[in-house]
Design a protein with these regions (language model features):
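Charged, well-structured binding/catalytic surfaces in domain cores that contact anionic ligands
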Residues: 129-156
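Long, contiguous binding/interaction regions
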Residues: 73-76, 110, 148-159, 163-166, ...
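Intrinsic-disorder/low-complexity detector
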Residues: 170-171, 176-181, 185
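N-terminal strand-loop-strand beta-hairpin
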Residues: 1-139, 164, 203-226
């Protein structure tokens, strides 16, 4: 299990083109290095047993129950099942994610049907993905996705931290307290680094999008699913 600290920012056409030029090496940003970009297509389907956000919260349903079909560079389709618990801190997501590959997706769809789950909503994402380093923060790996989601353009950047990084040299209650303090400190530092990162592209981190994808796609302020 790991923590995702993630920021997403809406882009204009010109901003999208600029970020694309940078990750494809047509433009340069001082202090930034990027891996070769991969072309992604993701189709996500979200499931729930309830009809409202209040019901979901009352019954403790995970924030995200998702099936994802994904291709990378037009290669074979891979499918993943994901459960995610989400927290929003200063409009930046801090998520705990559990994910497994699925060799036969039909098994999961039968499970959903027989267990009383229904599809909540879906989204499609066309993206370019790469890993980036800032010279000022060489120990951080920034996973960048430049994306079009249901016809709108976005930049998503995440830092992934492993909980195991905080589990050394302590035990029991002290270990739990130390791990929580370390996690909060790491989250705060990672949020700052994400804001520094998007500034490299002349983007304003105050424009970070606090809404879920469900709210963005449907225009709804209720029944948050992702």
């Amino acid at each position: 299990m790991g923590r995702e600290i993630e920021i997403k920012i809406p882009l204009t056409d010109s901003q999208y083109d600029y970020v694309r030029d940078v990750i494809f090496g047509k433009s340069s940003v001082p202090g930034l290095t990027t891996s070769s970009p991969a072309k992604l297509f993701k189709k996500d389907e979200y499931f729930t047993r309830y009809d409202s956000r209040d019901e979901r919260l009352k019954n403790g349903e995970p924030d995200v129950i998702r099936m994802r079909s994904e291709t990378i560079d037009d290669d074979e389709i891979k499918t993943y099942f994901t459960i995610k618990y989400k927290k929003l801190e200063n409009a930046i997501e801090v998520n705990r994610e559990y994910e497994s590959s699925v060799s036969n997706p039909e098994v999961m769809y039968i499970f959903f049907k027989e267990s009383g789950y229904h599809k909540w909503f879906s989204k499609e994402k066309h993206a370019y993905s790469c890993h980036c380093k800032m010279s000022s923060s060489a120990d951080f790996d920034f996973h960048l996705e430049l994306e079009i989601v249901n016809d709108s353009k976005w930049l998503e950047v995440e830092i992934v931290k492993s909980d195991a990084e905080n589990a050394e040299n302590s035990s029991a209650a002290e270990a739990s307290k130390n791990a929580k303090n370390a996690e909060n400190s790491e989250n705060d530092f990672a949020r700052k680094k994400l804001c520094d990162f998007v500034r490299l592209f002349d983007l304003d981190p105050s424009l970070k999008e606090p809404r879920s994808w469900y709210e963005i796609i449907t225009g709804s302020l209720k029944n948050k699913i992702n």
